[in-house]
UniProtKB/Swiss-Prot annotation:
It comes from Arabidopsis thaliana. It catalyses: chlorophyll a + 2 H(+) = pheophytin a + Mg(2+). Expressed in roots, leaves, seeds, flowers, buds, petals, sepals and siliques. Coiled coil: none annotated. It is found in: Plastid, Chloroplast thylakoid membrane. This is Magnesium dechelatase SGR1, chloroplastic.
């Protein structure tokens, strides 16, 4: 989620990148802190705003795209996914709400290098709704591997902001079906480092949006083995879970797509 350029150029002494007196319109998104200053003399250091401070969601910086989904359709009957990306040029977030991952948001060398997108999908498992969120920590190239611990820290810190973006962007759905606020949030951290390759339950959605929410390292309930009406969708719209075999890496096994590891239940 954090821009790799910001990770690589952290100053030895962190300085506040924001003044409390600055207006919201001039502040950059707290989700990504690779901010650009107008004066050239200040561009020698990449500012890292609120690196260890509170993460704040700013709705004015969120652009929402509805792509082929009906706001009135419950996600237990129609696939519903979220693709959240950030622009270093505009400092704004883009949230696509669609039936499958919006791959067009993930194109370009910067996106492939930073891997700071967050994707999620609604699932119904044995009659219970849940939101499954996926983050890429490391794998794919050595720079991501080098900063795996730092990336994990940033993702954990900023995920409440991401979830608030989901709630705000898909507000009509949640207003129509308030019971979805009680749906459990499962966060999948994909990494080739065993320590960070895990699944965590962040509790119900209303709690997960809080930075003080309770987190437990555990596994979600598996869908029914046979065809049924209590589980939906039958196939995940997140491609990270079923592609190339990756048995040879310590700590995880099973599948991998473009360097993304799938947490191994037997290792958790």
């Amino acid at each position: 989620m954090c821009s790799l350029s910001a990770i690589m150029l952290l100053p030895t002494k962190l300085k506040p990148a924001y003044s409390d007196k600055r207006s919201n319109s001039s502040s950059s998104s707290s989700l990504f802190f690779n901010n650009r200053r107008s004066k050239k003399k200040n561009q020698s250091i990449v500012p890292v705003a609120r690196l260890f401070g509170p993460a704040i969601f700013e709705s004015s910086k969120l652009k929402v795209l509805f792509l082929g989904v009906d706001e009135k359709k419950h996600p237990s009957t129609l696939p519903r996914t979220y693709t959240l990306t950030h622009s270093d040029i505009t400092a704004k977030l883009t949230l696509a709400i669609s039936q499958s991952i919006n791959n067009s948001q993930l194109q370009g060398w910067a996106n492939r290098l930073y891997r700071d997108e967050v994707v999620a999908e609604w699932k119904k498992v044995k009659g219970k709704m849940s939101l499954h969120v996926h983050c890429h920590i490391s794998g794919g190239h050595f720079l991501l591997d080098l900063f795996a611990k730092f990336r994990y820290f940033i993702f954990c810190k900023e995920l409440p902001v991401v979830l608030k973006a989901f709630v705000h962007g898909d507000g009509n759905l949640l207003n129509n079906y308030p019971e979805l606020q009680e749906a459990l949030v499962w966060v999948y951290f994909h990494s080739n480092v065993n320590e960070f390759n895990k699944v965590e339950c962040w509790g119900p959605l209303w709690e997960a949006v809080s930075p003080d929410g309770h987190k437990t390292e555990t596994l979600p309930e598996a869908r029914c083995a046979d065809e049924c009406s209590c589980c939906f969708p039958t196939v995940s719209s997140i491609p990270w879970s079923h592609s190339l075999s990756n048995e040879g890496v310590n700590g995880y096994s099973g599948t991998q797509t473009e360097g993304i590891a799938t947490p191994n239940p037997e290792k958790l």
